């Protein structure tokens, strides 16, 4: 069982959100009205930091205000999901940089993605974020 990163928990708490792991089919969902992020308890078996950061991305960008747009087309849903993924990567890069002493040139996309269980289809986004980091 993996624990949630304490820096990430601080961000969740500072934003006034609750984080609840429960038995559910989807990986995670953010409910703005209740200020709660629900995550599948199956995520506790591995590092769940990416999923938490992804849901924080929806919160930060106030995607709940765009629910009609989100549900309008597959394209609009994918666009908002990608935006949440990008924010998740940026949050995790910030945490990574605060936990490990390294030079920018030492950033390794593969190690970073493996550590945080970031889906491989986001590799180009991770690499771009690393280039723009700092």
Identify the function of each model-found stretch:
Residues 1-134:
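Active-site hotspot residues in diverse enzymes, especially metal/ion-binding acidic/histidine motifs
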């Amino acid at each position: 069982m993996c624990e949630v990163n304490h820096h990430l928990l601080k961000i969740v708490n500072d934003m006034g959100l609750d984080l609840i792991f429960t038995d559910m089919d989807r990986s995670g969902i953010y409910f703005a009205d209740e200020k709660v992020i629900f995550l599948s308890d199956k995520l506790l078996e591995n590092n769940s930091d990416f999923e938490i950061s992804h849901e924080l991305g929806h919160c930060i960008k106030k995607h709940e205000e765009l629910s009609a747009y989100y549900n309008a087309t597959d394209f609009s849903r994918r666009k908002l999901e990608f935006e949440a993924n990008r924010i998740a990567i940026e949050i995790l890069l910030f945490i990574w940089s605060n936990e490990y002493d390294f030079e920018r040139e030492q950033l390794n996309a593969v190690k970073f993605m493996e550590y945080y269980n970031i889906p491989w289809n986001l590799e180009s986004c991770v690499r771009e974020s690393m280039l723009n980091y700092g």
